[in-house]
UniProtKB/Swiss-Prot annotation:
NCBIfam families the UniProt entry points to: PRK00823.1-2, PRK00823.1-3, PRK00823.1-5
Gene3D superfamilies noted in UniProt: Transcriptional coactivator/pterin dehydratase
Keywords noted in UniProt: Lyase
Stretches of the chain forming a coiled coil according to its record: none
PANTHER family tied to this protein: PTERIN-4-ALPHA-CARBINOLAMINE DEHYDRATASE (PTHR12599:SF0)
Catalytic activity: (4aS,6R)-4a-hydroxy-L-erythro-5,6,7,8-tetrahydrobiopterin = (6R)-L-erythro-6,7-dihydrobiopterin + H2O
Keyword Lyase belongs to the record: yes
Organism for this UniProt entry: Burkholderia vietnamiensis (strain G4 / LMG 22486) (Burkholderia cepacia (strain R1808))
UniProt-recorded name of the protein: Putative pterin-4-alpha-carbinolamine dehydratase
Stored HAMAP family: Pterin_4_alpha
Top enzyme class: lyase
Origin: domain of life: Bacteria
Record-annotated membrane-spanning stretches: none
InterPro entries associated with the record: PCD_sf, Pterin_deHydtase
Length: 102
């Protein structure tokens, strides 16, 4: 079974993810990203999709034109796990050059 992060683990791990915020009413984190155009946004999603498939851990996301909203939570654990932290860190590395979300 996948280990759901404790409150203390969650606090410690999220300190290293300043662009991510808690989702109200859920044990999940989210980040909104804005890219130069649709092609850049879709390229980002493709890179994340490949990593997510390797991890067997898939994000919830929403895309309109140059904007991508990502939510991470582990359904099997009913909350935030180390898998979510790992995928969030990967996303942060991939999108280090993005525009600030509007």
């Amino acid at each position: 079974m996948i280990h759901k992060l404790t409150s203390e683990e969650r606090k410690t791990r999220l300190e290293g993810l300043p662009h991510w915020t808690a989702v109200p009413g859920r044990d999940a984190i989210q980040r909104s990203l804005r890219f130069a155009d649709f092609n850049e946004a879709f390229g980002f999603m493709t890179r994340v999709a490949i990593k997510a498939q390797e991890m067997n851990h898939h994000p919830e996301w929403f895309n309109v034109y140059n904007r991508v909203d990502v939510t991470l939570s582990t359904h099997d654990a009913d909350g935030l796990t180390e898998r979510d932290i790992e995928l969030a860190q990967f996303i942060d590395r991939v999108c280090a050059h993005t525009l600030p979300a509007a």
